[in-house]
Amino acid sequence: MEHGSSRGFIWLILFLDFVSRVTGKTQVDALIALRSSLSSGDHTNNILQSWNATHVTPCSWFHVTCNTENSVTRLDLGSANLSGELVPQLAQLPNLQYLELFNNNITGEIPEELGDLMELVSLDLFANNISGPIPSSLGKLGKLRFLRLYNNSLSGEIPRSLTALPLDVLDISNNRLSGDIPVNGSFSQFTSMSFANNKLRPRPASPSPSPSGTSAAIVVGVAAGAALLFALAWWLRRKLQGHFLDVPAEEDPEVYLGQFKRFSLRELLVATEKFSKRNVLGKGRFGILYKGRLADDTLVAVKRLNEERTKGGELQFQTEVEMISMAVHRNLLRLRGFCMTPTERLLVYPYMANGSVASCLRERPEGNPALDWPKRKHIALGSARGLAYLHDHCDQKIIHLDVKAANILLDEEFEAVVGDFGLAKLMNYNDSHVTTAVRGTIGHIAPEYLSTGKSSEKTDVFGYGVMLLELITGQKAFDLARLANDDDIMLLDWVKEVLKEKKLESLVDAELEGKYVETEVEQLIQMALLCTQSSAMERPKMSEVVRMLEGDGLAERWEEWQKEEMPIHDFNYQAYPHAGTDWLIPYSNSLIENDYPSGPR
């Protein structure tokens, strides 16, 4: 009997292995079909060179992300200079959640078969040359939240089936669509901006009442109703004055873009218990962050800005806030709404229960597990994707100016979410000139920004490089405690000194307890050093960082950089134990400024 059970168990293992191999091979076939359709030109071949048809699973390929069951969940091929057509075989990726093929030269039509991707959350095909209709089959995608097809050549009518989707973001502008704009379902929340520059008929205005013999009665009824509402409003105002701060009147809340909302001050006073100290999540240079609970029981984080206001800045503030709200990406903290009164400026964000990377690294509650190495790698990639989107894919480029572990938040799945972006410009909305105040945090500020006050996307790249070192070491970017051991107070300088002594193991966070892949640590350090070069021009763009983190081009960039830099430095370069790689240590500078703790928010 025992022998039979063992045999049955072995057969079960063999069967599961067979199923796994068949599933993996199906995914390989689907992606190879995509490669065959898109592989034109030397650059494209380089982008997809790791896609090997002989592999059992595609999970080791560049630009492909898998879950723990080796199912493909994400394709990241945005801005990859691809040409060709989409293929119906993409439907053979049943667990695909994110299909990112924006800003290429893709032609042809959207395959109907994409409607079979039942796990799809985000479909980004914008900025291509795709033609034909929007497939009605997309209406079957019950989990689709982000649909961006703008800047293509799509034609025909908008399928009514799309109105049933739980969309948070919709943009099908700048196409050749015709017919009516649906007004029901999720489409009711989107403004005309989502449909602009098409051949669509405008949405019908609300019908006006036709003249009749009862018009006088209607007027009387309306007047009576208005009087009743006025009396009720007066009573409520008297009733609420004992429970709320008395503030000047503000505009009624309204929806601007998607679910972006203007909240009333009273809503947020109730949500935060009048900005109670016990709801404080953190303090920063832009203001205080509070935990809040809305009337529908949704948890939010409310940032109470502390900037000085001058007369006439309200419209510019609202414009900048709406611009920030349009930056929507899986790895960006989405702005849910705002509140603006003569005395308050408030921003409302989703609440992040897992806090920030900084809090997970250095303020972890007792009993909570440390961030393991796979999570840290995933955080590095996710935050890079978010920053790359801010730099390259927003209508107006957004430079963060304070990239650090405390501003990289973690959602319920420990996905990295870049927070506090756009605030540097927002807080200067009354000033059209270059600011003389250098914004940022000690240890993260790029030397050229510190010396000249001029910022660029490369300023963020520097901060990102330091954040990578925080992920690897678990330490703060600036820490006076290191003086006790005669070490550099700047994390970047300390890392350089340790690397000169070839003590890689002493760099890695002790909380990992040795559970990391040494070659992967080396690669992240290489990336951090490339990002923190003293010359802004020599640093990679964030889009390049994403590709290198996905395994595309890091070795070549590192080798090239070493050859260029080696004659400049006067200390001895010894090959660090890593496949003939020299560790090159460039110069950097920093500014002393306080940082703030950041727990769940």
Curated annotation (Swiss-Prot):
SUPFAM superfamilies per UniProt: L domain-like (SSF52058), Protein kinase-like (PK-like) (SSF56112)
Coiled coil stretches, renumbered: none
Catalysis: reaction(s): L-seryl-[protein] + ATP = O-phospho-L-seryl-[protein] + ADP + H(+); L-threonyl-[protein] + ATP = O-phospho-L-threonyl-[protein] + ADP + H(+)
Domain of life where this protein originates: Eukaryota
PTM annotation (Phosphothreonine): residues: T272, T298, T435, T436, T441, T452, T532
Domain called Protein kinase: residue spans: 275-572
EC number, as in UniProt: 2.7.11.1
InterPro entries reported for this sequence: Kinase-like_dom_sf, Leu-rich_rpt, LRR_dom_sf, LRR_N_plant-typ, Prot_kinase_dom, Protein_kinase_ATP_BS, Ser-Thr/Tyr_kinase_cat_dom, Ser/Thr_kinase_AS
Topological domains annotated Extracellular: 25-215
Modifications the protein undergoes after translation, according to the UniProt entry: Autophosphorylated.
Sequence positions bearing Phosphoserine: S356, S359, S451, S456, S506
Ranges per topology, Cytoplasmic: 237-601
Residues found modified as Phosphotyrosine: Y449
One of the record's GO cellular component terms: plasma membrane
Glycosylated residues in this chain: N52, N81, N105, N129, N151, N184
Signal peptide: 1-24
Transmembrane segments: 216-236
Enzyme class, spelled out: transferase
Ion transport recorded as keyword: no
UniProt function note: Serine/threonine-kinase of unknown function.
Subunit-structure text: Interacts with TMK4/BARK1.
UniProt family annotation: Belongs to the protein kinase superfamily. Ser/Thr protein kinase family.
Protein name listed in UniProt: Somatic embryogenesis receptor kinase 5
Gene: SERK5
